Swiss-Prot record:
This is Probable di/tripeptide-binding protein 5. It comes from Pseudomonas aeruginosa (strain UCBPP-PA14). Pfam families: SBP_bac_5. GO terms for molecular function: peptide transmembrane transporter activity. The keyword Protein transport applies. Part of the ABC transporter DppABCDF involved in the uptake of various di/tripeptides. GO terms for cellular component: ATP-binding cassette (ABC) transporter complex; outer membrane-bounded periplasmic space.
């Protein structure tokens, strides 16, 4: 009772003191390509835009493994699986900034606008997206959605061309973020539509303040966020490509969270009483994409030889330092349609040389990024190991280190031979790997880095999405995995463990297995 009385006595004194603003600084590894998330597909850009600024109709709860309400409070699906009716949450505020003052809350017009700009080539906003809509196109959204219409001020009807078991989880992906139609109208009337990509407006937990490329992104907490004001007043992305420097900043207190640490830094952090290690198995696959449109990689035997030449065990130990498991196919092993009966390519340089006998092989290019990431902790070393393995099998290759933004842009154009890359599933559905990485539509959008278009594989992917039961889908996806393995479209590398390092005073942060970031409930203890 004394403790309670003492607390009550102090309360007025505590309330009289102005609270110091709490800032959460996150050391990230790269700059976002922009903030109009529909134009991009990298996690770096999704983290800096969709994850902090925007919301979607639904979200995917990684812990529960289910789709949960967000801007849509509830939804219903017709018996034929073609019509989805969404009831929108009322009273959701878009961000109020120096450059935009919303006159209304979110309604059906915003949802219709957000989808129509991706779906309708005649829509004026479709034409101003300089980078197109790669993720929506690779997921075949224009072919899937027949129409999106307003059926009430806070109700939207989406009608599909055909049933698709992946549609609802797809709506949790970053590219399905909902924009303010009112802000878009303001920009179009002012003749500055490009500002949607540089001065973003959303309804999410944080409000955009400023971006300095390769240095910093600044955000402020959204006091009107429908799920409650964030626990911190400001969020900073301190762009720090060097993992060693990220750790140094964390130790000095310049950052409270450091993303994508090197495996050795994780072990070092475990011994530091001021730091915490957060981790989870990542729903991701690191791989080298083999561009099947570039001879001699158009020959399956050459691609198979590359897989046989590669020493995966040595690579994992040297690059991931024991923090990842070997990838033998496209899926992480915890995927529900993972085909366990498909054997890995063994490390067999002699067999690789036999497959290449008599072939005149030009020198190949190995493309990699300059700075490390979760899916590629040591890009330079990894590329050198692959180069040496290929040389042992009689394949000459040179290494090109290319800045991340340029690498993605040029890889989408198919300029690469061998490309170190990684893919993170967004929602736990197996199709989230297949459609964006192996469909013919995704060759056009640029995300199919193997540049492989096969009608038989396309049919397996389409049939898998249309199937009504998980058992049917699993059978189809097993066939797809077998075809991809036989054609050797990828050189699978690893399934990493996702790590983040935080200071002890950080509370409420969790690592997401899909690589998404949620800082809305993260607090910094004083």
């Amino acid at each position: 009772m004394r403790l309670a009385a003492f607390s009550l006595f102090l309360a007025p004194l505590l309330l009289a003191q102005p609270a110091a603003a709490a800032t959460l600084s996150v050391c990230t590894e790269a700059s976002p390509e922009g903030f109009d998330v529909v134009q991009y597909n990298s996690l770096t850009t999704t983290n800096a835009s969709a994850d902090v600024l925007m919301n979607r109709l639904v979200e995917f709860d990684a812990g529960k493994g289910t789709v949960v309400p967000s801007l849509a409070e509830r939804w219903s699906v017709s018996d034929d699986g073609l019509s989805y009716r969404f009831d929108l949450r009322q009273g959701v505020h878009f961000h109020s900034t120096a450059y935009f003052k919303p006159s209304r809350t979110l309604d059906a017009d915003d949802v219709v606008f957000s989808f129509q700009r991706m779906l309708d080539p005649a829509n004026p906003w479709h034409k101003v997206a300089q980078n197109g809509f790669p993720h929506a196109q690779s997921m075949q959204l224009p072919e899937l959605i027949k129409r999106v219409e307003k059926s009430g001020d806070h109700q939207v009807l989406i009608v599909l061309d055909h049933p698709d078991a992946t549609f609802l989880p797809m709506l949790s992906m970053g590219f399905a973020s909902i924009y303010s139609a009112e802000y878009a109208d303001q920009l179009m009337k002012a003749g500055t539509p490009e500002k949607l990509n540089t001065a973003p407006i959303g309804s999410g937990p944080f409000v955009f303040k400023r971006f300095q490329k390769d240095a910093v992104v600044r955000y402020a907490a959204n006091p009107e966020y429908f799920a409650g004001k964030p626990a911190v007043d400001a969020l900073i992305f301190a762009i720090t490509p060097d993992a060693n420097v990220r750790l140094q900043k964390l130790r000095r207190g310049e950052c409270q969270i450091a993303l994508s640490p090197k495996p050795l830094d994780v072990e070092s952090a475990r011994k530091d009483a001021s730091l915490k290690v957060e981790q989870t198995p990542a729903f991701m696959t690191a791989f080298v994409a083999l561009n099947t449109q570039h001879p001699p990689l158009d020959d399956p035997k050459v691609r198979q030889a590359i897989n046989l030449a590669f020493d995966r065990t040595s690579y994992l130990q040297a690059v991931f330092e024991g923090s990842a498991s070997a990838a033998t196919g496209i899926y992480p092993p915890n995927t529900w349609s993972y085909a366990r009966d498909i054997p890995a390519y063994p490390h067999d340089p002699e067999q690789a040389r036999k497959l290449l006998a008599g072939k005149q092989l030009p020198e190949l290019n190995i493309w990699t990024r300059p700075s490390g990431s979760l899916l590629n902790p040591n890009p330079s070393l990894g590329a050198q190991l692959l180069q040496a393995d290929l040389a042992e099998a009689g394949i000459k290759a040179n290494i090109r280190v290319i800045e991340w933004g340029e690498l993605i842009r040029r890889a989408k154009n198919g300029e690469h031979d061998l490309l170190f890359m990684g893919w993170a599933g967004d929602n736990g559905d197996p199709d989230n790997f297949l459609t964006p990485q192996f469909s013919c539509a995704s060759v056009k959008s640029g995300l199919n880095f193997a540049r492989y278009c096969d009608p038989g594989l396309d049919k397996l992917i389409a049939d898998g999405k249309a199937a009504s039961s998980q058992e049917q889908r699993t059978g189809l996806y097993h066939q797809a995995q077998k075809l991809i393995h036989e054609q050797a479209l990828w050189l699978p590398l690893a399934h990493p463990t996702a790590f983040a390092l935080t200071r002890q005073e950080v509370q409420g942060y969790q690592v997401n297995p899909f690589g998404r970031q949620d800082f809305s409930r993260v607090a910094v203890k004083r």
